[in-house]
Every structure is written in structure tokens, then in C-alpha cells.
Amino acid sequence: MADNSKTRVVVGMSGGVDSSVTALLLKEQGYDVIGIFMKNWDDTDENGVCTATEDYKDVAKVADQIGIPYYSVNFEKEYWDRVFEYFLAEYRLGRTPNPDVMCNKEIKFKAFLDYAMQLGADYVATGHYAQVETDENGVVHMLRGIDNNKDQTYFLSQLSQAQLAKTMFPLGGMEKSEVRAIAERAGLATAKKKDSTGVCFIGEKNFKEFLSNYLPAKKGNMVTEDGEIKGQHDGLMYYTIGQRQGLGIGGGGKTQEPWFVIGKDLTTNTLYVGQGFHHEKLYATHLEASEVHFTVDTPMPKEFDCTAKFRYRQADIPVHVSLSEDGTKATVTFKEPARAVTPGQAVVFYDGMECLGGGLIDRAYQDEKELQYV
């Protein structure tokens, strides 16, 4: 068996079951393990998460149980500057951002990775459900986690070769149920703790209320394509394309079907609504993306076929990708029209099990017509 005792791995510990088991497995494999809790949000704010203190206590309990040193590091400034400001800027543009993608790129695998290297780390490890494999040429490939329901490569799609080469994902080859079972067998303090949901580091608070602390909401009309006013919206930033909940308008209309958000117009502060889950305005034939990035350094061909997803836990769909000359922009054409393609979200490319990378969706089109700004 390899002697791992000289290899230092710094584990990002959140106080959840996944990162707890990550630390346990590495410790059992003989690595020199250090646990680090990242404090990325000021929870003294009256609307902030009040769970950071509890989470850190859980990290301390687990670290003591498995016998590893642990520390807390404060990345509030980095998080605010690199993730939260971006998040607000996207909402101001009427888009729906994905802060988790940015948080992984800028905090967990940049600020945290840099900090870990200062502690003499050879690798960092997290509880993400993803896998890394190095080929015979030393190129690191990121593969989906085998638990289809938990695979998190969508959120890791902006990571670089340099970041992946220094990263371990011990849970990537496991099902979530196995991870829970390991935690319970080991009697870890977090074994029965429920998974966190909600925005990266902001937790599960009322999102609408939270956002209104930072961005002024401006009410306006909810209008059909024919110009009929159906009601008032609370502020365009609170709505996303394809959304049904929270509109406060029943069936009626021509078809009695539920109403969905089909577009926003920032200039007139109008929210467009249409009836039916399969409303034609919700279907795009292609999208344009920017900030396109691939996990391997080898240049990609300018045109290629692969599969893609443009939201977490969505099944992949077959697409054709055309890259710009410099490779940072892409036109992604779907083999069949796709529903509720949302500007601000990530589009992520796959080749079988491998996550190739991705970009941020700027615009969605139905044939030649731009959608969502009806």
C-alpha cells in the first residue's frame, strides 16, 4: 500500500456530511489531513445565515472524532468582491446568475486553494460528487460523479487544469447513500445532518427578502403577448424564465392552463406571461454563451458535437458547438428545441462521462428571434 503520510491534503469542511466523510476517508487512507472551515458570509447581518457558528462547531466535533487539526479561515471580502458583486450585477441586468459556479472558480478552488498551498498542502479535497483522472500524458480529466442524482460537475465546469491537478474528490465514485452509511458507521456528528440547499453560502433564508436588501425592487405590469395586463409583478429580478410559482394568477384565458414567465423587458419593466408548460416562447433552438472555458488546455476544434446541460440535474441533450476565433464565445445549437434556456445560467459540455467545460448563457434564440426579451 502506498505511503500517503507524506502527502498533505487540506479538506474544505462545511460542517456537512459530505465533507466530513471526505476528511474521514483521506485520514483512513493515511494522508496528512487538515480540515479548514471557510467563513464566506458575514452572518452577523440580521438577514444573514446564523448557521455558520453551528456549522463550525460540527466541523470541530468531526475533526476531533477523526483526529485531525482544523482551522477557520475568513474569505468574506473575497466572496463579496468576486462572487456577490457579480451575482448582484447579473440580477441588475435581468439575468438569473448561478453563484455556485463562480464560488467554486473564485473561492473554493482559488482563494481556498491558495491558502491551502501556504499550509504546505499537496492537494485540496472537497465533498463534491465529481471525479478526476490523470491520463498517460499528465492531463487531468474531470468526470461526472457516479451518483447521477448528486453529480456536481455542472458547478465545477469553470475549473482549470492547474486547479484540477491539485484537487481530490474522494466521494466521486460513491453513491450518496454509501456516504451517509459511512458517516453513521463511524458515528460522525454530522451523519444525520440534512443536506444544505439554497445559494452557495447564503443558506436557506427567504431569497426574495434577502435580495431586496441589496437591490431596489420596482413593481410593474405582468402582461400577455396580446398586451392584456394580468396583474403586477414584484420586481423583474425575482422571476426566472419558465417559472410558474409566485405569479398569483390562476388559469382562465384561452386554455385554462397555468401561467408561466416567458419574458422580461427591462426597458419597460414588464414581465411577460404565457399559458401552458409548453408555451412556444419557452423553446429555444440555440443559445450564445460567453466566458467559455475548457478543463483541458488542448485547444478544442472550432466546431464539435457533444451533449450539454444548462441547469443542474437536467438530462444532457445533444448539441452542436461553434466556437469564436479566440474560443471564449460559443453558439450552441440544440438537436431539438430546449425549454426555458435562461441567460445568466451556465451551459456545460460533456463527452460521455467527461465534463469538457462550459460558459455563461448570454442569449437564447428561437430560430432568428431572440427570446426572453419579447
Swiss-Prot record:
Q: Which EC number(s) are documented for this chain?
A: 2.8.1.13
Site (Interaction with tRNA): which residue positions? Answer: 128, 345
Q: List the disulfide bonds.
A: 103-200
Gene3D superfamilies, per the entry: Adenine nucleotide alpha hydrolases-like domains, HUPs, Translation factors
What biological-process GO terms show up in the record?
tRNA wobble position uridine thiolation
Q: Where is this region: Interaction with tRNA?
A: 150-152, 311-312
Where on this chain does ATP bind? 12-19, 38, 127
The UniProt entry, under CDD domains, shows:
MnmA_TRMU-like
Principal location = cytoplasm
Q: Which GO terms describe its molecular function?
A: ATP binding; tRNA binding; tRNA-uridine 2-sulfurtransferase activity
Q: Which controlled-vocabulary keywords does the entry list?
A: ATP-binding, Cytoplasm, Disulfide bond, Nucleotide-binding, RNA-binding, Transferase, tRNA processing, tRNA-binding
| Reaction(s) catalysed (UniProt annotation) | S-sulfanyl-L-cysteinyl-[protein] + uridine(34) in tRNA + AH2 + ATP = 2-thiouridine(34) in tRNA + L-cysteinyl-[protein] + A + AMP + diphosphate + H(+)
Pfam families xref list:
tRNA_Me_trans (PF03054), tRNA_Me_trans_C (PF20258), tRNA_Me_trans_M (PF20259)
Q: Specify where the region named Interaction with target base in tRNA lies, as residue ranges.
A: 98-100
Q: Where is the active site?
A: 103, 200
Q: What GO cellular component entries does it have?
A: cytoplasm
Where's it found, cell-wise?
Cytoplasm
Q: What does this protein do?
A: Catalyzes the 2-thiolation of uridine at the wobble position (U34) of tRNA, leading to the formation of s(2)U34.
Similarity comment: family membership: Belongs to the MnmA/TRMU family.
The cross-references to PANTHER family, in alphabetical order and at most eight, read:
MITOCHONDRIAL TRNA-SPECIFIC 2-THIOURIDYLASE 1, TRNA 5-METHYLAMINOMETHYL-2-THIOURIDYLATE -METHYLTRANSFERASE
Q: What is the protein name stated in its UniProt record?
A: tRNA-specific 2-thiouridylase MnmA
Please tell me the species this chain comes from.
Enterococcus faecalis (strain ATCC 700802 / V583)
Highest classification ranks of the organism: Bacteria, Bacillati, Bacillota, Bacilli, Lactobacillales
What is the primary gene name for this protein?
Answer: mnmA
